[in-house]
Amino acid sequence: MNIKGLNHLLFSVSNLEQSIDFYQQVFDAKLLVKGRSTAYFDLNGIWLALNEEKHIPRNEINESYTHTAFSIDESELESAIQHLKALNVNILEGRERAEQDKQSIYFTDPDGHKFEFHTGTLQERLKYYRDQKKHMTFY
């Protein structure tokens, strides 16, 4: 099997209308279609889907570091932070990082899904780890 790439991201949400507003305002996602319990967006070429599932437990999501990270230019980090603050988005306390690890801001959607705007690349991270993390094995 040959994986061609990422097909889509789908998030379960408790309130479709509230989540549509969030994804449009925070990510500038273009709404493509909306049904009774589903919405599809184009997020800079990424297919983003929301499914409304009102009655599922959501508390455990707060305990996990699982998140979706989007790349942004370092020069845009401060304006991204101000944009999130202006929208009253729940911004999370970031973790301590070395300068080589670049910069990030973490935040959640109304259902607690975690997101990150990150200024680094995989190549930069691997170089940093090769240089500084001698306990790691590279393939």
From Swiss-Prot:
Disulfide bonds: none annotated. It comes from the Bacteria. GO terms for biological process: response to antibiotic. GO terms for cellular component: cytoplasm. Residues 5-120 form the VOC domain. InterPro entries: Fosfomycin_Res_Enzymes, Glyas_Bleomycin-R_OHBP_Dase, Glyas_Fos-R_dOase_dom, Metallothiol_Trafse_FosB, VOC. Mg(2+) binds at H8, H67, E116. Its cofactor is Mg(2+). GO terms for molecular function: magnesium ion binding; transferase activity, transferring alkyl or aryl (other than methyl) groups. SUPFAM superfamilies: Glyoxalase/Bleomycin resistance protein/Dihydroxybiphenyl dioxygenase. Its EC number is 2.5.1.-. The active site is at E116 (proton donor/acceptor). The keyword Cell membrane does not apply. Homodimer. HAMAP family: FosB. This is Metallothiol transferase FosB.
